[in-house]
Regions:
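Short, small/polar residue-rich loop motifs at catalytic or cofactor-binding pockets
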Residues: 186-189
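C-terminal accessory region of radical SAM enzymes
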Residues: 105-111, 141-181, 206-223
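Short hydrophobic/aromatic beta-strand element in the GNAT-like acyltransferase core
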Residues: 192
Length: 223
């Protein structure tokens, strides 16, 4: 989505929301001009939420990542062992931990949410999580006990001021070809909508393929 079209969407959305989630499917940090998009959000007095795999943190300066428009950064740590990468675990975690340290050193007001969405009854990611929890425990002087977390299933644990680690089960993107729909609910059209890069308006971010097209945002006013 080019900047001109993005600004037109933000301008039209202003009467309806105060927050913009800068992704539907994908990683907003792959955009080299992310700062320009954040400038537009800030221009209209809105807040941005960035959700990233963590792989592209080093592509951006802290002036961008801590842009005054950014309300929170969500980092999906479980993406490390679900993607082919030449990075070692330590190389992957280094910019994540550096970001957290810089947030504290600079007294930035945004939230950093570290997501660990890979918990299951079989503890299939036990080895990865054990290493991850040891790393986070050491970095933040907070004990993250693997067995306790699996047993008690906390939603989140505070690591430091506005830095939290969040836990959940595996997330699977919905598909019409999937026979198991599960029991989840969606707040699409109640609390939010999504706009794809093509301009299609859909009920929520789960409809990344535009199956339920409500409007073509390029030609139809947002209202």
């Amino acid at each position: 989505m080019d900047l001109h079209f993005f600004e037109s969407i933000i301008q039209q959305a202003k009467p309806y929301t105060k927050e913009i989630a800068c992704h539907v499917l994908g990683d907003p940090l792959t955009q080299s001009n992310l700062h320009d998009y954040l400038d537009i959000i800030h221009k209209y007095g809105m807040k941005a939420m960035l959700t990233t795999s963590g792989y592209f943190l080093k592509k951006h300066s802290y002036d961008t990542l801590f842009h005054p428009a950014v309300k929170q950064i969500n980092i999906s740590l479980n993406s490390f062992n679900k993607n082919d990468t030449s990075l070692t675990f330590d190389q992957y975690m280094a910019p994540v931990l550096s970001l957290c340290k810089a947030k504290l050193d600079r007294n930035e007001d945004l939230f950093i949410n570290l997501r660990v969405w890979n918990l299951d009854e079989m503890m299939s990611e036990r080895l990865f999580n054990e290493r991850l929890f040891l790393t986070l425990s050491s970095a933040f002087d907070v004990k993250l006990d693997l067995d306790t977390i699996y047993h008690e299933k906390p939603k989140s644990i505070r690591l430091d001021s506005k830095i939290l680690v969040h836990f959940d089960n595996y997330f699977e993107w919905p598909s019409l070809s999937n026979k198991n729909y599960g029991d989840g609910t969606c707040q699409g059209l109640q609390s939010h909508i999504a706009i794809l890069a093509s301009g299609k308006v859909v009920p929520c971010c789960l409809d990344c393929d535009g199956v339920i097209e409500l409007a073509e945002g390029i030609h139809v006013p947002f209202s």
